[in-house]
């Protein structure tokens, strides 16, 4: 039997395509080693994407991390030790016994929109925070302000109802930056500040880019362009650094590999502390934990150093109270409760628990909490306290632990600066109430001089430690990594800011990663929205609509209009049912979206204003009807998180997910069909056994593992492609496909294995049919029999599998999207679920239901086109 000459040609074409996709880094903007692009552009990796870009409306640490000091500035700023320094206010005076603050503003300052920063703008900024409908999460910090007055264009007066010793510290927070009256309403998507960088572009799910502010009132930045890239997965962060896709990573999320970068001369590293106190939170409303002896026993049972070594791989600073070690007022109280299990057992016996007791430890999602929980549970077990661990998602944790106080213990990090005053709140989730502690907080708020405040701060620390309010574990570490040629990149310990105002490359670097991954922002509009081209979506939509129309016309012609109308009716009924089911499930899911958005320190007034703004104060039924009515008009609603239309969000993500799914399906089909045909033709032979074994391996290998392997080989070792990310279709077809080829291949391999096995089985079954024997009797060769007679009759189950695979690949690729940090639909859905962005979850699920039902409908109609027997039945 002579083999078909087409097979080697097909293999050659596939091989050539692979070489073009993987072997032409210049065409796709692939990276080289660190320091291989333009010397005045930098890309910084960060783990979290900011939900909006207005620091005055959301407490997300990611907003402060990238915007504070770079785009926005405040009247004052924090020094590294927590003291207050001038910024937009060059000096200030405190008079009237601490009841009046007069700020003298820096001259010649302008906002990025060209408007002047003066006392009127400063008054607008503070009045906006204090307004009754304000959604500022830290509004309560300025509650003692009675009036804000303009003295002259460069002088601002703030009057208080009573002394506020922490006012200057509060004004240094990111929530109180100065905003332009003319553009403040649009800051959520197009931020306008006074900083050394201007906002340029936000590619949601992928990156945010700033450009140098040439009119900056201070010393201009040396970098012309800065891009912050969102990389949530620790393995992806590692790969992005090693491949040179990013020049730096702020708060590197994988402490287990940090030492490798510290030993690599290509990188510089920094280990420091943050404002986040990691504590074993105790609910003193629960009987055993309300006893001081029990709480002290727990403190003696904890071995902080073992917890740090096991949970944080040795990075972190032991603490003995709720206070950051980098603050000048810090008091080291770790020696108050040394690790002493015998002492712990003695205290438990004295409290009436000689045999210990049982508790539940509810843990939020972060890895530090889960790893610490394992160690804490083991240490408490040594003194007789039996711990049952329960893992929660953030929304569940906020609902059960923080809001309803339904917990015994929890482990969580408190990241807000100067947040020791939370222990003075009786309604706080710890359940701690102390008249003496409240008196200390009141005295601190009434004290203005630094020595007096320092003494009171140390008394506050000692009181919390003596009362063993919580098990104080460690100050969360700050782990930063950057290109060794990148100088003067500063990382703030208090607000977590990545300060790029002085950053620059030394003479040994020819470029930063931004130069490798794109040509800067000479592309696209700088309007602040995602500038990815909608053309691929429009083309795909037009193509799918044309295919659907053709299939519908064929079905109507062969089976009649009644059949087609019936199928369309089933599709419509399914969608209507899906909207109701999805809405109900989302509404009964635990977790308050407003609490998630506003954080643990938000005051009730700001939360109520936000709830009203989002329409969450409306009853469920009217809200459902309003949503469905919008769907009928093509309006999916507005995202709680991003504050933009959900339809726009979905369209942006489909520009990645739809081509990714199509490319993965194309690759899986191109691999599966030859494998199945060869295996079926040579069934029972050695080649069949080898191919069957390969498909079995394809089923067994997880696609995310394969994806990481591909990244390590082609991005980290060979530097042929980027480790991840998506440059946008505006960067060119080659760049877009180059970014999708590895994730598509990782997705395609398991799907190809499934498809090959299904097709092989269908072909073997078909080869026993009478018409196959007839074809052979007429002299047809084996390959002709397979290709012309067996394959068309075996395609029905294959089409079913292909339809299911496309639906899965469209939104089920969330793990691969995280590995390759792609801004796809699956990642959007996952983030929306975690963030309790209900309207996005509802809309994405309904869209996916529509996709699944539509694809299934089209697959059913396509059966008559590929199967000769069905065509004959249709004609009959």
Residue spans of the language-model regions?
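Alpha-helical secondary-structure segments
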Residues: 43, 118-127, 153-157, 195-196, ...
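N-terminal lobe/hinge region of extracytoplasmic solute-binding protein
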Residues: 45-96, 127, 190-194
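Surface-exposed binding/hinge segments that line
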Residues: 104, 138-181, 201
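Gly/Pro-rich hinge or "lid" segments in bacterial periplasmic/extracellular proteins
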Residues: 164, 169-221, 225, 233-235, ...
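Ligand-site clamp/hinge motif
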Residues: 185, 214-259, 377, 386-388
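Detector for C-terminal structural segments
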Residues: 203, 301-329, 368-377, 395-527
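An internal, D/E-rich "acidic patch" concept
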Residues: 530-533, 617-673
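Alpha-helical transmembrane segments of integral membrane proteins
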Residues: 561-562, 572, 578, 654-687, ...
């Amino acid at each position: 039997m002579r083999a078909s000459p087409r097979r080697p040609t097909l293999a050659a074409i596939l091989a050539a395509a692979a070489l073009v996709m993987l072997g032409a880094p210049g065409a796709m903007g692939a990276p080289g080693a660190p320091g291989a692009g333009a010397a005045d552009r930098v890309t910084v990796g960060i783990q979290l994407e900011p939900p909006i870009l207005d620091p005055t409306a959301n407490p997300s640490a990611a907003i402060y991390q990238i915007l504070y000091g770079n785009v926005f500035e405040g009247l004052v700023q924090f020094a590294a030790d927590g003291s207050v320094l001038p910024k937009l206010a060059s000096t200030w005076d405190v008079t009237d016994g601490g009841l009046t603050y007069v700020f003298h503003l820096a001259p010649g300052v302008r906002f990025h929109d060209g408007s002047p920063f003066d006392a009127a703008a400063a008054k607008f900024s503070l009045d906006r925070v204090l307004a009754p409908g304000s959604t500022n999460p830290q509004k309560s910090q300025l509650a003692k302000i009675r009036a804000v007055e303009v003295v002259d264009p460069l002088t601002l007066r703030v009057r208080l109802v009573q002394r506020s010793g922490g006012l200057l510290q509060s004004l240094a927070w990111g929530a109180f930056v100065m905003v332009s009256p003319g553009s403040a309403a649009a800051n959520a998507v197009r931020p306008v500040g006074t900083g050394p960088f201007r906002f340029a572009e936000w590619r949601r799910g992928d990156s945010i880019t700033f450009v140098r502010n040439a009119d900056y009132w201070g010393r201009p930045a040396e970098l012309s362009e800065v891009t912050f890239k969102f990389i949530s997965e620790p393995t992806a962060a590692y790969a992005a650094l090693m491949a040179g896709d990013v020049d730096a990573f702020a708060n590197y999320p994988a402490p287990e590999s940090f030492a490798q970068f510290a030993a690599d001369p290509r990188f510089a590293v920094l280990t420091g502390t943050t404002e986040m106190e990691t504590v074993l939170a105790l609910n003193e409303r629960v009987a055993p934990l309300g006893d001081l002896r029990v709480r002290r026993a727990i403190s003696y049972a904890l071995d902080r150093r073992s917890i740090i070594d096991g949970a944080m791989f040795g990075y972190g600073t032991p603490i003995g109270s709720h206070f950051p070690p980098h603050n000048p007022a810090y008091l080291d109280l770790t020696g108050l409760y040394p690790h002493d299990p015998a002492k712990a057992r003695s205290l438990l016996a004295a409290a009436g628990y000689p045999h210990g007791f049982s508790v539940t430890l509810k843990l939020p999602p972060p890895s530090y909490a889960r790893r610490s929980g394992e160690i804490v549970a083991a240490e408490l077990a040594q003194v007789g306290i039996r711990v049952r661990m329960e893992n929660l998602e953030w929304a569940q944790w906020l609902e059960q632990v923080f809001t309803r106080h339904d917990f015994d213990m929890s482990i969580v990090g408190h990241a807000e600066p100067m947040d020791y005053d939370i222990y003075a709140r009786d309604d706080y989730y710890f359940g701690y109430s102390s008249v003496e502690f409240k008196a200390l907080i009141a005295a601190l708020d009434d004290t203005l001089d630094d020595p007096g405040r320092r003494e009171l701060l140390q008394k506050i620390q000692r009181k919390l430690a003596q009362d063993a309010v919580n098990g104080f574990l460690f100050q969360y570490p700050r782990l930063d990594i950057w290109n060794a040629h990148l100088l003067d990149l500063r990382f703030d310990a208090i607000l977590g800011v990545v300060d790029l105002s002085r950053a620059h490359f030394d003479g040994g670097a020819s470029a930063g990663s931004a130069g490798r991954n794109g040509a800067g922002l000479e592309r696209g509009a700088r309007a602040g929205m995602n500038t990815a081209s909608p053309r691929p979506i429009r083309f795909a939509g037009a193509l799918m609509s044309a295919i659907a129309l053709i299939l519908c016309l064929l079905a109507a012609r062969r089976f009649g209009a009644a059949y087609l109308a019936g199928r369309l009716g089933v599709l419509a009924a399914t969608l209507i049912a899906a909207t109701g089911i999805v809405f109900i499930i989302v509404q009964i899911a635990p977790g308050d979206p407003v609490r998630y958005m506003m954080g643990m320190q938000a005051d009730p007034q700001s939360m109520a204003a936000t709830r009203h703004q989002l329409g969450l104060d409306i009853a469920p039924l009217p809200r459902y009807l309003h949503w469905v009515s919008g769907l009928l008009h093509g309006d999916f609603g507005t995202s709680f998180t991003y504050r933009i239309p959900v339809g726009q969000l979905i369209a942006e993500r489909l520009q990645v997910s739809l081509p990714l799914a199509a490319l993965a399906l194309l690759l899986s089909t191109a691999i599966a069909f030859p494998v199945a045909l060869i295996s079926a033709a040579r069934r029972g032979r050695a080649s069949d056994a080898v191919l069957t074994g390969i498909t079995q391996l394809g089923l067994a290998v997880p696609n995310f593992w394969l994806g990481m392997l591909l990244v390590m080989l082609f991005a980290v070792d060979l530097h042929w492609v980027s480790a991840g990310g998506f440059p946008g279709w505006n960067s060119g077809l080659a760049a877009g496909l180059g970014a999708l080829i590895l994730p598509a291949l990782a997705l395609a391999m398991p799907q190809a294995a499934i498809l090959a096995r299904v097709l092989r089985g269908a072909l073997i079954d078909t080869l026993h049919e009478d018409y196959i024997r007839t074809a052979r009797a007429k002299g047809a060769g084996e390959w002709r029999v397979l290709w012309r007679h067996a394959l068309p009759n075996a395609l029905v189950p294959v089409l079913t599998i292909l339809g299911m695979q496309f639906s899965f690949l469209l939104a089920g690729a969330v793990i691969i999207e995280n590995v390759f940090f792609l801004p796809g639909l699956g990642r959007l859905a996952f983030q929306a679920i975690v963030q309790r962005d209900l309207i996005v979850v509802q809309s994405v699920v309904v869209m996916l239901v529509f996709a699944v039902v539509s694809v299934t409908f089209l697959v059913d109609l396509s059966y008559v086109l590929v199967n000769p027997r069905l065509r004959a039945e249709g004609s009959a």
